[in-house]
Amino acid sequence: MTTSHDRAVLNQILNPLMPTSDSGMGEVHLESDKVDHPGYTLSSQLEREAVRLAESMNVTDAIEKFTEAIQVCPLNPSAYNNRAQAYRLQNSPEKALEDLNESLRLAGPKTKTACQAYVQRASIYRLQGDDEKARADFAAAAELGSSFAKMQMVALNPYAAMCNKMLAEVFEKAKTGDN
């Protein structure tokens, strides 16, 4: 069994260019969405139904259900975020970006929804070849605690990629006994 200190040391060895968790920020505790709207409960229920539809690859019906959830409560950032994911599954990145922008506008700055929306938007930007926008959104998600975003930040950093490659080569040589 490893301690949190052991994991922190290993993380620093394996990801030397990433900040340590004791860099003054500590662990990020994300808030849940706080939506003050009479339709929020029904919207959340419709959203759960839409997620089930999407998980069964019934994406078109899922998008319709997410849209219904948004109509019931247009202030629900999670519904926009989840519909964006469905749009991505449908290969509609522009619609996904519109929903992600709206989700981020509505979400609190330190919410799980904001973190997820930043990661999704960064992924779209990266696929579109806009590494600057991708880097900015991955950085925002990394600050909110996304380990995936942290890995992507390293991947987008050419110096980190070079360091990781050299480190992998050193470990491989040590393992095989080559000098």
Swiss-Prot record:
Single Gene Ontology BP annotation: tyrosine metabolic process
Annotated organism of origin: Caenorhabditis briggsae
Family: Belongs to the TTC36 family.
Full protein name: Tetratricopeptide repeat protein 36
PANTHER family tied to this protein: CDNA SEQUENCE BC021608, TETRATRICOPEPTIDE REPEAT PROTEIN 36
Gene3D superfamilies: Tetratricopeptide repeat domain
Alphabetized Pfam families for the sequence: TPR_17 (PF13431), TPR_8 (PF13181)
UniProt-listed PROSITE patterns: TPR_REGION
Gene encoding the protein: ttc-36
Keyword Repeat: yes
TPR repeat segments: 43-76, 77-110, 115-148
UniProt entry keywords in alphabetical sequence: Repeat, TPR repeat
